[in-house]
Amino acid sequence: HELMDRAGARVVEQISARWSGLEGLRIVVVCGKGNNGGDGLVVARLLRQSGVDVVTYLLEPESCFGTDARIHAQRLRDAGIETQLVQSPAELELATHDLIVDAILGTGIRGSARPREAAFIEVLNLSGLPIVAIDLPSGLDADTGVIDGAAIKASLTVTFDLPKIAHLFYPARELCGALALTEIGFPAAALDACPSNTHLLTSEQVGGALPRRSAIAHKGTCGSVGVIAGSAGMTGAAALAAQAALR
């Protein structure tokens, strides 16, 4: 649950930075039953303790929560902060608020959101309010970037330590809005132990692999490039590769 504390703190920091402080904001936090919902409970507590007007909706009773999320639900109660269990999207009161925190579904989803979750997602999207997604907009598959059904269209997505494929690949990338990559201190050994055949190549890595050129270098001193590519009607890639070599 300590990671949830840190995740929630990073989300609050990003909200404060993007909205030029927390003063005067009226925020709705919508929580599912999983770890993403637990992060949302931390956000709700920290916002309320910062003097923000917060309404926290739970899509499931606390008896359905995971262990860590239950801990943070208890902390809310200990702080005297109320939550509201809702059965349908019609119970959400959104019109008088400034923004929504989406904590319905996280990286554990496979396939599409269930019909009940999808109904809440659709109502949040139609509200016209900016939405801050915790880790991943609800409804997206973190591992594919595919949109299969209803998904939150976020203004800001706050994720932790490493980006997910859905943060980088379209069409899912479009639903993430601005992406804030923050650190919460996942153990390096745990990250290294996660098998992955996907590697993120950055411009810094590519630039670091290029040899340094002499100040008096020119095209005659830097070797030759042969481009073998393209076919009739499909010559765009060949042209781009040749232009890149010339530059």
Please give the residue ranges for each predicted region.
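Small-residue (G/A/S/T)-rich helix-start motifs and N-terminal tracts that mark the onset
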Residues: 1-60, 66, 156, 167-247
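A broad, structure-centric signal for solvent-exposed, well-ordered loop/edge residues
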Residues: 10, 71, 83, 90, ...
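Internal gly/pro-rich beta-alpha loop/helix module
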Residues: 97-99, 104-196
